[in-house]
Structure formats: structure tokens, C-alpha cells
Curated annotation (Swiss-Prot):
The protein's name: 4-diphosphocytidyl-2-C-methyl-D-erythritol kinase
Annotated EC: 2.7.1.148
Organism per entry: Sinorhizobium medicae (strain WSM419) (Ensifer medicae)
A Pfam family: GHMP_kinases_N
Pathway: Isoprenoid biosynthesis; isopentenyl diphosphate biosynthesis via DXP pathway; isopentenyl diphosphate from 1-deoxy-D-xylulose 5-phosphate: step 3/6
Source taxon at top rank: Bacteria
Enzyme class, spelled out: transferase
HAMAP family for this protein: IspE (MF_00061)
Any one GO MF annotation of this record: 4-(cytidine 5'-diphospho)-2-C-methyl-D-erythritol kinase activity
Assigned keywords, A-Z: ATP-binding, Isoprene biosynthesis, Kinase, Nucleotide-binding, Transferase
Gene3D superfamilies in UniProt: 3.30.230.10, GHMP kinase, C-terminal domain (3.30.70.890)
GO biological process: isopentenyl diphosphate biosynthetic process, methylerythritol 4-phosphate pathway; terpenoid biosynthetic process
Binding site for ATP: P111, V112, A113, S114, G115, I116, G117, G118, G119, S120, A121
Lineage, opening ranks: Bacteria, Pseudomonadati, Pseudomonadota, Alphaproteobacteria, Hyphomicrobiales
Length: 303
């Protein structure tokens, strides 16, 4: 997203990529929802949501990955941005508050169905942007409930800060001491179905995520991360072999830690510094020009 916002819109809200540094599947509820424990951070890159008051509701899309959105993206039922608008509008209407017509624009910079929370981040950004545009506010707990109606990953995307998510994603604990990492995101531009990955998961109850106390240095955090895992990575690799090629490319480029994010197919590599990350991204892009490759930083504590 351009740093000066999306041209022609009164307001632009960033929708940063969500990175699952670790994702442990620890159980399954009777209703079928899986219980997760995930260490999450957010990247400086992502999608963008433009908002402006309008005479009638309007939705437009641009960006590298706009053509990859399904035809249903312009229908309310298949679009988290429009669903977020409608859920928030109904909530405000129930309180007798105005929520007028709006032009929403999605700048789609992240690959679709890629394991880095693009749709969820877009929905969260839409909720935050519309509250600002409409001059409204909600109690944090109520906003979180509305976000959960849209999807399990939406509540964690509201603040864009490092956290641990538990339950189905709604139990959120802030992790203010997580360092900012130089990171490279790589996706081979193959979509991976989250429901299929979960169905292929053989063991539904795995060891929990354990976060050691007194992690004071980046090195200590990296050691802790190395002991964690993404339980969805083995079934995702079985479903899409290109994930292994992506991981290998990051390892060969010198990443200190490589792991898949979410249900894939995006993998990330953590690097010692931004220069190393940029060089790695250039190397991978040169050998795989059709892949999505992005060097960036994550949210977190500097120094």
C-alpha cells in the first residue's frame, strides 16, 4: 500500500499481513471447530482499505492480486469487507446511530488464500475505518464480538500487534516484548484450502504452545520459536508439494528460522537484519520470478 494512502479516498486503513510464527492445534470442539494456540505477529506489508462517503454503497478493487479474487468478491456473502460493513451498520442502526452509504476500495496486495490473513485483516481494517468515517465507537469487547462473527482470525487483526491467540482465535493475550524481526514472505502462488488442510490433520490434540518466561533477547526468542511448530504444515505439504520448495528456497537463502504461516502456502524466513532479508528476497525472486516474495519487518519491540 502506498504510504500516502489510496488516491481519491478520504481515509486509508492498512490491513497488515498476519504471520503465525507458531500454530499449535490442541483440540477440537464438539461443533467441529479446532482449538488453537498461536503466536502471531504482523508485517509492515499488506492490503489497504480506502473509505469515502458516497451517495450509494460502492465497492471497487485494485492491486496485483485483484484479478485472483473470486466473482463472489463483489457479493456481500462472499466478501469479508462488505460483510464487515453490513455487520457494523446493523449494530449501529440497532443503537439508532447513522451509518451512511460508503465507497469501499480494497487494494489487494497479498496473495489470495495464502495463510497470512489477508481477508481477515481486510475485514478488521474495514471495521476500524468505518468507525472512524462514521464518527462512531464501540466498546472493545463488543467490537471483538462483531469481528468474531466475521471469522475466527478477524479479532486478532483489529490491533495489528503481537499476541497469542487461543480457543478458536478469540482468546487474545498481547505479547508486548516480542521483538521485531527482519522477515521474508514467500508464496508460490498456489491457493491452499484451509478446510482441506484441517481435514488432512491426523492428530487433533497436540502439545500446547509453551512460551518461556524472561525472554529478553532476540536470540532467546529465536531459540523459543525453534522449539515451536505449525501443526498444519505437514498436511499442507502433503496437499501442496510446492510448500517444500518454498521452505528450501528460504533455507538456502540463509534464513535462521523457516516455517509455514497459517494453513499455507506462504512460508516465512527470519533473518539477522534487513540487508540479509533484502538480499535473500532478491535471490529468491531471481530464481522464481513468478512467486510472491517480499522482504519486510514484523511488528514488535525494536532493539
Amino acid at each position: 500500500m502506498r504510504p500516502d494512502g489510496i488516491a481519491g479516498f478520504a481515509l486509508t486503513i492498512a490491513a497488515p499481513a498476519k504471520i503465525n510464527l507458531a500454530l499449535h492445534v490442541v483440540g477440537q470442539r464438539a461443533d467441529g471447530h479446532h482449538l488453537l494456540e498461536s503466536l502471531v505477529t504482523f508485517a509492515e506489508c499488506g492490503d489497504g482499505i480506502g473509505l469515502a462517503a458516497a451517495e450509494a454503497d460502492h465497492f471497487t478493487v485494485s492491486g496485483r492480486f485483484a484479478p485472483d479474487l473470486s466473482p463472489s468478491a463483489e457479493n456481500t456473502s462472499g466478501n469479508l469487507v462488505l460483510r464487515a460493513r453490513d455487520v457494523l451498520r446493523r449494530e449501529l442502526a440497532s443503537q439508532g446511530r447513522a451509518a451512511g452509504p460508503v465507497h469501499l476500495h480494497l487494494e489487494k496486495n497479498l496473495p489470495v488464500a495464502s495463510g497470512i490473513g489477508g481477508g481477515s485483516a481486510d475485514a478488521a481494517a474495514t471495521l476500524r475505518g468505518l468507525l472512524s468515517l462514521w464518527g462512531a465507537s464501540l466498546e472493545p469487547a463488543r467490537l471483538g464480538s462483531l469481528a468474531l462473527e466475521l471469522g475466527a482470525d478477524v479479532p486478532m487483526c483489529l490491533d495489528g500487534r503481537p499476541l497469542i491467540a487461543r480457543g478458536i482465535g478469540e482468546e487474545i493475550t498481547s505479547i508486548p516484548d516480542l521483538p521485531s524481526f527482519a522477515i521474508v514472505l514467500v508464496n508460490p502462488l498456489v491457493e491452499v484450502s484451509t478446510p482441506v488442510v484441517f481435514r488432512l490433520l491426523i492428530r487433533k490434540s497436540n502439545p500446547p504452545l509453551v512460551l518461556p518466561e524472561n525472554l529478553r533477547s532476540t536470540a532467546a526468542w529465536l531459540a523459543a520459536l525453534a522449539s515451536m511448530r505449525n501443526d498444519l504444515e505437514p498436511p499442507a505439504r502433503a496437499l501442496e508439494p510446492m510448500i517444500e520448495a518454498v521452505s528450501t528456497a528460504l533455507e538456502d537463502a540463509g534464513a535462521t528460522l523457516v516455517r509455514m504461516s497459517g494453513s499455507g502456502a506462504t512460508c516465512f524466513g527470519l533473518f539477522a537484519d534487513e540487508k540479509s532479508a533484502s538480499l535473500a528476497a532478491e535471490t529468491i525472486s531471481a530464481s522464481q520470478p513468478r512467486w510472491y516474495v517480499r522482504a519486510t519487518r514484523t511488528a514488535g519491540k525494536s532493539g
